[in-house]
């Protein structure tokens, strides 16, 4: 689970690549104002999940909903992309604003809201095929129709065969995902209502999840250089094949992990989706589902310092020969989970004169049984690195005899365990009130009873850590072996709390074209079960998380431009983050739990422009300053040296201060269009203390879509048009490097994640 920050800027991003956008289903669009189409599937980091719309804070986890319910309750263990894809089983998608999401779900975030294809009286089929020049093939099929006058059916199949942009020698595919949907719908009372029973089966294996790192040479000016013989995005920084010895956190036994294992996910889900329009104008919706994922597993790779060693340092290759050259201390986490949830949401709504009222209820139950084991190893710095062995004394060995080993530091870095459940019972409402033709008020509130009961191991982690009663051993200065007793057991933590959310939005038209808008939203929550998988917050650290969002600005609209400009403030208190801190210049790391605040002040201007016939442009500019507050940590390493990190008032890592988006689209003919998407991400800091950074970069997309006739559509698109070879995210092992030390790292070998390489994709769609 390893709680790593994924950060988001505050701009709502409107996209225009038509091939990726879906319309709302008719029964939903009848009850909503028409919204801009927004492409959330163009993701420069991962082809298999939606991009994360940015609001200036770490992710609040689930941001995709299906038929009004979370696609996965929590993606901390059971990953979203393992159970949901934007496929032919969907009738359409929409985008919930932070205000809407806060009231309906308790999370302040832009969220994708998707709706299932339920069918219609006549038979229809959709077959989509996609491929790229690396060998990826994707087949997506939906069949739907009617049975008699009052029954509908739908069936879908999604198959993804993605080898990635480089060959993983230990497996054929970086992502192999299968999704199957079946559903039947009963039409009620001449179309006034419907009841649908839907089944979904997912089976996903995604070893590409841990193959997204690359070594590079860091230049002090924010740029990187390629290492000879290694092309980021085109070469693998994962071994060809092999197995590793590790210490199982739960059993305390040494076991073997084969690289082809550990990324398996499969789940079964059954859902009841219904709605009914009463004669008095009230619309009632009732949606519920049960999902069980007996395997929700994934693997994480991490890095540390890259250094040069000589033969005298004792590293050996698998054939027993001595090694000299560059090595990196690598880290691996094996995550094993079982997840189930039972979710229910019901809403009633009605237009009452100039009020549009909605009242809803959530009853969401989630059960988690999860643990992870970690180990460390040393590898060569090259494509398909070779694993190196070294002399190692296992702290669980009472003889304290050194043996040659490829793995070490078992469970020293953030092994996790928790088992338990959480439940949310919430009542919420919204009202859209048209006070006058010029003045509109939207407001809402949410009150949520939250109960969590989880097993927690609060004991600090150490080399040889596992559950149970046992001894670890160390050699004293006089040569004697000293034993230390351990009794590691989980203790139950139960919490009963009230969370709340509220929102108020005011819109006033000064003229027919120009107006003012302002809104304020607040949401609160307490630490979740996933945050107890590590050492977790103590009673003193257990505090309410509060997220206020305040925005205000202007809007202007005429025949050719729709423009808005807003100033935004958002903050989050008591954010919980588990950090692995590496001692600079070494491979040694320690895990600490951090609780801190973040606040962001920014300005965003967005425009939809239609300057001439057949041409549309979306443009966006954001300037923001996200900073840490109360961010302090210290750690003591094995040699007794204590080091600290103080990131107070420093820019949050990975968040750019400048964002630009340019998305032109031109209709060449009625059935042929060309589109581009350019996104600029300004300078981002790659560590906690503003010492290392990456220069700004462009993420670029483009394509042509051709509707050949009513039955056939074709498309071609390009990702990373200019084949930019940049790094992004953080730099491994750099957490404790300060500004004063930054100059020493000019020209140093480091590692981190990278942009998706130049990719050409082809698509075809058939309707029948």
Where are these regions (language model features)?
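Repeated loop/turn-to-beta-strand initiation elements of outer-membrane beta-barrel proteins
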Residues: 124, 150-153, 190-197, 281-284, ...
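Structural signature of Gram-negative outer-membrane beta-barrels, strongest in the C-terminal barrel
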Residues: 339, 358, 362-364, 412, ...
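Acidic, small-polar-rich N-terminal luminal/periplasmic segments of exported/outer-membrane proteins
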Residues: 22-122
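Face-selective signature of the C-terminal outer-membrane beta-barrel domain
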Residues: 265-294, 324-464, 507-509, 519, ...
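Gram-negative outer-membrane beta-barrel transporters
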Residues: 562, 569-573, 589, 593-689, ...
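Conserved C-terminal beta-signal and adjacent last beta-strands/turns
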Residues: 8, 144, 337, 543, ...
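Transmembrane beta-barrel wall of Gram-negative outer-membrane proteins
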Residues: 124, 131-162, 166-237, 262, ...
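Solvent-exposed loop segments that connect transmembrane elements
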Residues: 209-256, 300-332, 379-413, 453-493, ...
